[in-house]
Amino acid sequence: IIFVLQQKNSKKNKVDFIQTKEEERLVEKLRPTDKIILLDEKGIQFDSVGFANKLEKLEHQGFKRLVFIIGGPYGFSTVFKNQFTDHFALSKMTFSHQMIRLFFCEQLYRAHTILNNHPYHNT
């Protein structure tokens, strides 16, 4: 899990400035061998089993790391979004990025229990 501190918001900092600063910090932590997936409200939605299956396929593609990026309060700039082809959405609803961290970690755990036939996920 890569954690990047969000840019402090002030009256003089415009949204594009905040997005750029957060994205610069993110890029510093990425490696060329990473598979990057943005968590974005306009991304592809999965149910839990579908997400588990997608995760399994990604894990078998030979990437050193799967990196899921959660944007800050203002999301990602269009330029940043366009650098990556994979965008997943957890919901059509809007949540704080802190809540998405929690929800996404639970879904990662759930996906692994589904793939390992663990009873955590009841179908």
Regions found by a protein language model. Give the residues of each.
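A short, terminal or domain-edge coil/loop segment
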Residues: 49-64, 91-98, 119-123
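S-adenosyl-L-methionine/SAH cofactor-binding core of RNA-modifying enzymes
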Residues: 5-64
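Rossmann-fold NAD(P)-binding glycine/threonine-rich loop
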Residues: 71
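Structured adenosyl-cofactor binding patch, chiefly the S-adenosyl-L-methionine
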Residues: 78-122
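General small-molecule cofactor/ligand-binding pocket signal
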Residues: 2
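Short active-site-adjacent structural elements
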Residues: 47, 76-79
